[in-house]
Amino acid sequence: RDQLLHAAVPGLTIGMMLHGAEKILDELRAATSRGAHPDRIKELVDRLYRAMRPVTNLLKNPNPGKTSAGILIKEAIFSAEIRLKRHHITLINGMDKDCPDFKVQGSKQMLVASLTNLIDNSIHWLETKDPKQKYLYIGTTEDIEGGAAIIVGDNGPGFGKDDPEDLIAPFFTRRAGGMGLGLYIVNEVMRVSQGRIVFPNKGDVDLPDQIKGAVVALQFLET
């Protein structure tokens, strides 16, 4: 089973990318049906192109390369922007608040897909809890021992008493209709990127006051 899951990770990662593109396509169809302004149609077509380009890039060149945390965050925010607005979620971008940038070694496409998956999880659980004001935070930290990390957090229900080992186990999910593979795939992507997925406790990292729910860190280990 483990061998099959490892072999499936690239394909499942592409599936996560296509999920983001599908949301843009839905918005594009809705815009055309209501006769939206041509500039809006053009904007959505451009977004769809940018969402699909990483898929073709991954298929052409799956090998790891060099990028930065800031670029990964920018790309992930771009792919999730429409969904965040649709669900009335306020984005707090730590990179606008002097969070440190750092170099990253790995597959840019897979890492962006991993971040997008974390954002998608936050959107889902924020809708489930439905607080009066919904917040999503994405930034970086050097507070976790072992290496710099990208942080995604929200003010949803959090992970409760779930064990971190269970959260990254394949087929473990509390999401109705979920496959239980999202965090497993993210963990595998981090493993091959010389990193790991971490679930910081309250007080482990510096976060905006609004972020009181789930917090996930993608840590790139120092070598």
Q: What are these model-derived regions, one by one?
A:
Residues 133-146:
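Short beta-strand/loop element within the Bergerat-fold HATPase_c
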Residues 194-207:
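Glycine-rich ATP-binding loops of the HATPase_c
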Residues 154:
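Acidic ATP/Mg2+-coordinating residue in the GHKL
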